[in-house]
Amino acid sequence: MRPAAPGTTPNGASSDIRHQRGVAPIPFGSTNSAIDAHHNSEIRVGRHRAKLDEIRESLKAYEHEAGLLSSHVALGSLATPSSSSVSHSDITNDNAEVMNFSSSSSNAAATTTTVSSAAVSNSNSFRTEGGGHKMRITPMPQRHLMMDTGANETVFRSGKEMIRNGNPSTTISSTPSTTTEESIRIHPAGYRYDMPTPAYHMNNNAPQYSPGYSRPPPPAYDSSPVNTRMTPVATDNYRTHLHMKVHPVVKAPPPNPTMLNHNKNMAPPPPPPAKSTISIETMSEERKADNIQRLYHTSMDKKTASSVVSINVASPHTTKVNVGDSPLPSKSFIIGPRYTADVDRKNFVNYKDELRPDPRLIPSTSDANHEDFRPILFKPRNLEITMKSRAQPPPPQYNQPSEPPPKRVSSPIDRTLLEPYIKNTRRVQPCKPNMLRFYMEQHVERLLQQYKEREKRMKQLEKEMVSAQLPDIMRNKMLGLLQQKESKYTRLRRQKMSKSHFTVISHIGVGAFGKVSLVRKNDTRKVYAMKSLEKADVIMKQQAAHVKAERDILAEADSPWIVRLFFSFQDDACLYFIMEYVPGGDMMTLLIQKGIFEEDLARFYIAELACAIEYVHNVGFIHRDLKPDNILIDQHGHIKLTDFGLCTGLRWTHDRRYYGPENDHHRVDSFSLPPEVAAIDKSVKVLNVRQQTRRITAHSLVGTGNYMAPEVIAKTGHNQSCDWWSTGVILYEMVFGRVPFHDDTPGGTQHRIKNWRNFLDFTYCGNLSKECLMMIQQLICDASSRLGSHGKDVAERTAQVKNHPWFRGIDWVNLRKLRADYIYIPRVTHDEDTSNFETFQDNDRADKPNVRGLHNPAFYEFTYRHFFDTDSVGCPSLRPSRRRSLRPLLENGTFNESVSEEDSSSHI
């Protein structure tokens, strides 16, 4: 070995550099232990940036000495003494590990021992205590194999050599080697890396071994970050990350004598574990239970209670984790495919060197993300285990051409798509339990209603096909078309609508809560009547229940007597009803024009009004606001009912008390007994009472003053017969030209209605028939004797009205097809004609909408789309003919061009 160059220290560093850094040079005659002590105390790799230049010079000297030693070994001038040994208890594995070798003879010749050690390869220089000669420790050719001895020990076999319990079974051959360091590196089959290197755990004496692939020598600590290489990661199928930490066992408090006496028959608690053993095993379905491959094994005692082991296990098979606490039996945990980011390896001791040579056991390369960890139950008190894994493409076969690794992304969702989602989710605010219950009740009711409507359409189609005597092939075809229509309707209901989809043509009406406008749909160019209600006014005047009832009856209505609803939607300020446009005007406008109707014309309108009321009652509603303003006339002179703003369906969603104040919704009558019933018998079931009574009466004061029934004003309870009172008042106004109980003073009209016997005047009746006067008297009377109030069902009660002598000769079946000279036919030139309405200019309020009305749960389930909205028109009465019959097609193969004179509005 050549002497140290002048101006250099024994470790190869320049004395000038040491003086520049303010460090005193080390004497050349210092012993190896003193030098190592000084080296460990002064030079700490990666700690003091001021030492970087010194370390660089040391590494250069180290490389120069390695070349000389290689030449010296080639000449065979050195031999390894048989008495040389390596003390594993003196080996530590830190950022730089130093090994002390002792020789049995101080005068022995300088020798070089060849030991495969990753820790030694990271050291800068080594010296012997005796002759002062340097010892170059180079890796030796070893191919590590693994076997289980059954005693939780890892045994490695290297040809004819074996290392057991940290002691070499045979000494290293002293035969001179003529091979250089570069020529003895091993490249195991199936691995891309070179130089297998055993390592040593710093916390115990058992040797630990690194993977079959080796890492290149560590780069200079002052090198550029670009040259810094991370630990390579092999391609894996299921990557499971295990994070294990052992805590010191907390001593239990002194036992309580009372508890000891109480639990004297119980077994004493086990002693605190002196050691925690962690092992990781993998099993495949092809292998048996007795052929388990152990990937990792380590032991940690009390001295290393704060140490942490963090590894990754990559295996397509089941992986088992055995955690044993001596003297307790071991426990097993099955690793599931859970994903987590890898933990930063800088947090753990000997992280790189505790890995077995197996491609399924790979190091961690990502940053720490402790929030994703999930602890496993039933673990020892002093051991923490957290794990997760993620699925990855299967690893390529080494005997086949390897494919490029898959591209890994940090997040499966693009940031541009994720930001709007996060922004919108912040707008979601928690709600009160009553509000959630309110929404769920309405939502479930709407789902049930949609199911009933779908079944109804199916039965109606089957009934029509039976009446048309269609063959089975045609029936199946029609049923298939209906299913396609149902699917399309389901998709249409999910599409959100807004006011921007329509263009306002003119405003034709105004009410207490909103206005009515003639609009045109932008995509179909069809004309509709749009009724808009301001949410703030609806909430302030407590009309949410009435709006809900109006929406329900318009959505459920399937009759030519009712104005059809096509869409309903809402925005932050208003509720919108998109309805059928009836261009003939209303009955009030006609009364103003004519003054008094002829008896035949009055009979015709009252007969059609009776049919409309019958339909409303059949679907379970009460209009409660019948007046000439709410009776529209189509272009053929027939009537349609509209404005169901005060309608009630005798349902809990139509009860104003159910809505209550905002965010405080209580169904006061849904699951509670009436006071009079509860006082009689408390054992009566709620459902039985609700089924029997079915909300027979209502108690709210509604309707227009001149047409209200006396029981409505007195709040004694009213039922469907109140609509027949309003019918009698309308008939009186038609034939007499005035309302019967009008008074100009406030409250005078209600006083006259309550005392109707004193104020009902039949003078100046003109040429009215006795039957007409009798009809008025039997409608404007007490509810007990009123027409339409007796009978078990709606049909029987309505028959009392239809069978009156005044209606003798009325064809109730073909009433809507009636064409007569006395029928008023409004003048309509085109579908956007508004000459029969009084138009006005819109004066929209510029005020911001009331915040209380924006997210009020009273408007849940308000959106609606008609089933036939795709093939219907805004003004159905303008359609020239009804749908063609399929019978001529089946009989003659062609359609019959002739169509009957049937009103097409009933076929939309």
Swiss-Prot record:
GO cellular component: apical plasma membrane; cytoplasm; membrane; plasma membrane
Disordered, as annotated region: 115-134, 162-183, 203-225, 388-412
UniProt domain AGC-kinase C-terminal: residue ranges: 808-874
Biased composition (Pro residues): 392-404
Tissues where the protein occurs: Expressed in muscles and epithelial tissues including pharynx, intestine and hypodermis. Expressed in vulval and spermathecal seam cells.
UniProt cross-references to Pfam families, sorted A to Z: Pkinase
Domain Protein kinase: 502-807
Gene3D superfamilies: Phosphorylase Kinase, domain 1, Transferase(Phosphotransferase) domain 1
Required co-factors: Mg(2+)
PANTHER family, alphabetized: SERINE/THREONINE-PROTEIN KINASE, SERINE_THREONINE-PROTEIN KINASE WARTS
Subunit composition and interactions: Interacts (via N-terminus) with yap-1 (via WW domain).
Function: Phosphorylates yap-1 which may negatively regulate yap-1 nuclear localization. Plays an essential role in larval development. Regulates growth, the formation of gut granules, lifespan and cell and body sizes probably in synergy with the TGF-beta sma/mab pathway. Does not appear to regulate apoptosis and proliferation. In addition, may synergize with the TGF-beta daf-7 dauer pathway to regulate entry into the dauer stage. Maintains the cellular integrity of intestinal cells by regulating the localization of apical actin and junctional proteins.
Protein name: Serine/threonine-protein kinase WARTS homolog
